[in-house]
C-alpha cells in the first residue's frame, strides 16, 4: 500500500473512533443506582422520611405504595401514568375497574411537594412511586430492595391497555402467568409478587361471587363464616368500605403466612386458590410457605424486574410539576 493509502486508512480510523466517541457521549443515561446523587442528593432520604411519617399517621398507606408499583409498572411502562387524573377526553387509569380500591394518591403529592422544596423540577413522579413502594414494603416487614432510579414521567394515561396487561382476579392461572411473562417475570417471580396479598384487604365486590348464591366448595369451611360476616350482601355497594383482611393472622406484616393460608384453602380470590393448586405454581407455593428467606429473595428480584419495565429515560417523557397532571395540563 502506498503512502497515500496508509494516510487514508489512518484518517478513516480516526474518523470512526471520533464518531464512536460522540455516540457514547450522546447516549442518553438509563436507570442507575443513586441517579440523583449530584442533582438531589437527599432525594431518597426525603422519600424514606415522608413514607415513615405517612405510615405512622395512616398504616394503610403502605399497602397503597405496594399496589401502586404493580398497577403502574405492569402496564407497558413504569412511567407514573397511573397517577394522572382523568381529562375530558381520557379516563385516567386509576378510574378503571381494574384499579378498584386504589387510593391514597394524595400522599404521593405530599412526597412530591417535599422534594420540590428541596430540588425543584428534578425528581420524577415515577421514581417517587417506585421508591415509596420500596419504603412501604420495608415498613410492613418486607425486605429492603435496592432499586435504580432515573425514570421520567409519561405524558398520557394508558387506560386502553389496562386489561391487556393487568390480570383480573377471575382469570385462569395460565393467563396470569402469560401476562407476567410478557414483562419478564417468571413463575417464581409471579408466585412471590402475589405474596403481597399477605397484607391489606380484599373488597367484598371482588369476592362475593365465591359466597353467593352458593359458597364455593373449594373454600375452607372454617373460614367461610368470617367471610360471610364481613360481606353480608350478595351485591355490595361499591362505595361502601366492606372488605376482608387478606391474612387474619398477620394482616399488617408482609410474610410467608399467605402461602400457608392458600394451601389451607383460605385464599380470598380465585387466583389465590389456583396459585396453591396448579401444578406449575404449587411446588413454589409450598417452598415459600416453609422458607420466608426464599420468598423474600424471589420477591426482591420480581420487584426489581417490575420497577425496570420499559422506563422512560434521558430526554423521553418529562418531569411533572404535579404528579396527577401532565405539564401541558398544568
From Swiss-Prot:
Record's signal peptide: 1-23
Matching InterPro entries: Haem_peroxidase, Haem_peroxidase_sf, Peroxidase_pln, Secretory_peroxidase
Keywords of the record: Biological rhythms, Calcium, Disulfide bond, Glycoprotein, Heme, Hydrogen peroxide, Iron, Metal-binding, Oxidoreductase, Peroxidase, Secreted, Signal
Binding site for substrate: 167
A GO term for molecular function: metal ion binding
Cellular component aspect of the GO annotation: extracellular region; plant-type cell wall
Binding site for heme b: 197
Gene induction: Expressed under a diurnal rhythm (circadian clock control).
Positions contributing to Ca(2+) 2 binding: 198, 247, 250, 255
Cofactor annotation comment: Binds 1 heme b (iron(II)-protoporphyrin IX) group per subunit. Binds 2 calcium ions per subunit.
UniProt miscellaneous comment: There are 73 peroxidase genes in A.thaliana.
Stated name of the protein: Peroxidase 42
Organism for this UniProt entry: Arabidopsis thaliana (Mouse-ear cress)
Lineage of the species this protein comes from: Eukaryota, Viridiplantae, Streptophyta, Embryophyta, Tracheophyta
